[in-house]
Amino acid sequence: IISAIVGISMAYMGVGAWALVGQYLTNSFIDTFVLFVTNDWRPKLQFSFERAKQMLSYGWKVLLTTVVYTIEGDLRSLIIGKKFGSADLAYYDQGKKFPNLLVSNINTSISNVMFPVLSQCQDDRIKLKRMCRRAVKTGIYLLAPLLIGLIGVADTFVVAVLSEKWIPCIPYLRILTLVFLVRPFTTTCQQSILSVGRSDITLKIEVVVNVVAIGILFFAVFGMESVLWVAYGTLAAEVVSMGMFMFYENRIIGYTYKEQLQDLLPGISLAACMGILVNLIRYVPINDGLTLVLQVIVGAVFYVTVSYLTQMDSFVYLIKMLTEKSHNVKMKKILERMVKE
């Protein structure tokens, strides 16, 4: 909140792009200060070459994986801007912004939480797999309706929120939302592989995926000369990434292909039905703002109702977890009635 106030204040003062710099630096400073105050650990003027050697043998692969991923992502925007111009780049980036907004914070949370938790049971592959399955099922159950719902309401959302001048970004929004749909799954798989000390595998996957992605990117830009093909290429590269992670999950922790599909498909299938339903609502003859509100309400009611009627595993798990956390007696009773014994 403080960093946002600083950024907005600097923008009103007319400092231009420096407002973003001020907001970012303020946010980083406050984060560091809060961690310093709340954490008992303090750095000491000591250095262990033995520990540094152990950390570097593992950490350089993780670092290089992140660098390769970042370079490939920035290269795509750079080439689109150079080859097709700022307008096409703006439509592409706008299409990526909203699904990225939904997924990025969740993905960061998954990375920060999953790695230390999974590392504690790295020697117990059965428990490790069980925790991965729970994370995948719950993550896809929560995210699929948001992302597939965004695909369903894309037309009314763009017009109502951004205005009609952004209509050309709708195809990119739909395609790139599918890209982000599988990110939590691949992130969970990545953290499980890292937790057993196999950072070499995540580096291998990232290199292969990015070689494929760059090859598709150049074909889309210089062969097909289409930004839309760039978006499809991004989706294809994500499918390759997902396939490789599925292979290594099966190989390393015994998370079989059948189990992975069993965990992914229920949430995605229900969300797809919801997406089709909310998309049909756009034909109701009312203004775009009201249509968007109606789509969101109908979609949410449909998703929760079907989850309740079918007693989906992730729905039951979340309700039981909320029941345990709730201190309100009336709320507990309501939640308990939602789970059929």
Please identify what each model-predicted range represents.
Residues 250-257, 264, 276-341:
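Membrane-proximal transmembrane or re-entrant/amphipathic helices at the cytosolic face
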Residues 91-207:
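Specific pore-lining/lateral-gate transmembrane helices of multi-pass inner-membrane transport
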Residues 24, 58-66, 70, 74, ...:
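Residue-level signature of transmembrane alpha-helical cores of multipass secondary-active transporters
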Residues 17, 33-78, 113-130, 251-266, ...:
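Interhelical loop/hinge segments that connect adjacent transmembrane helices in multipass membrane
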Residues 65-70, 214-218, 271-286, 337-338:
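Hydrophobic alpha-helical transmembrane segments in multi-pass integral membrane proteins
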Residues 2-30, 200, 207-243, 255, ...:
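Membrane-interface helix-loop junctions in multi-pass transport and translocation proteins
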Residues 17, 54-62, 79-100, 129-131, ...:
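Interfacial/gating helices of multi-pass transporter permease domains
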Residues 1, 9-13, 18, 39, ...:
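Membrane-interface junctions at transmembrane-helix termini in multi-pass inner-membrane proteins
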